[in-house]
Amino acid sequence: MIGILEEDELSSVKVLAFFFFQIRHIESSIRAVKAILAMYPKDIWARAMLVRCFDALENYQSVIDVTDDMMLFDSNPEIKKSMALLRARAMQKLGRNEAVRKILSEIGMN
């Protein structure tokens, strides 16, 4: 047991969230991911999936809000970089070009 759910139960909820995302039932994916985050607030996979869902809905302010603390992704450099890129895209969509340049510089893509 890893917490509130057994490990296989948590994996099942993650598979369900990803399935909903893949079939474009984004709101259902968000509900599943938020349930995971309610039980496991530091779950990097769930936080990243939430960002992807908001990006798919073109809810760029929510992408920015969820990625405000990029240190939450420090334990997984690949996820952190993809979240930084989605954050930069959201900033660009909202016309915050200086913030985009800063993010790209921080991840070595200037």
Predicted regions located by residue number:
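Short coil turns that delineate tetratricopeptide repeat
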Residues: P41, S75-E78
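Start-of-helix register in tetratricopeptide repeats
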Residues: S11, W45, I79-S82
